[in-house]
């Protein structure tokens, strides 16, 4: 096979793969994800989420998303926001148990807007996020404590989510 024929074949195969990828619907969240569909609007859920975080033992560390920046460029996309949530107490405790695990902090809530304006709240359970770090901890004690901290965070995130998604 000539170099030219190989190039054409590679191009066609690549294009075919791209066409298949475009036709496949987006994957649903994987293991560890929690997803709550709501009847709230995107802006309502964002407001309720921030309020629920402020009433918890955690704080909003960051609040970012492409929606507003896209609008400034004249592009209209559905609401999409990532809210990073954590606190210094958990940061210090987790850092003392696993330096590599801190790359995961803050843990994120994900607020998305559906096609009819309703919002969805999603997050990955902290225990799922930190499990690989507990599995590879230096000591059994560190592993146990990291799992315990992760479970505490699971409860806090669930409480925040419940409070944010209740109809007000």
Regions found by a protein language model. Give the residues of each.
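N-terminal secretory signal peptides
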Residues: 26-85
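Mid-chain, structured segments of secreted extracytoplasmic proteins
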Residues: 67-110
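C-terminal partner/receptor-binding element of secreted or periplasmic proteins
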Residues: 127-168
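N-terminal signal peptide c-region/cleavage motif recognized by signal peptidases
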Residues: 21-24
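Stable alpha-helical elements in mature extracytoplasmic
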Residues: 45, 49, 66, 91, ...
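Bacterial N-terminal signal peptides that target proteins for export
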Residues: 1-11
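Flexible, solvent-exposed short loops/turns enriched in glycine
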Residues: 103-104, 108-138
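A mature extracytoplasmic/lumenal domain signature
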Residues: 64-66, 87-89, 115, 125-127
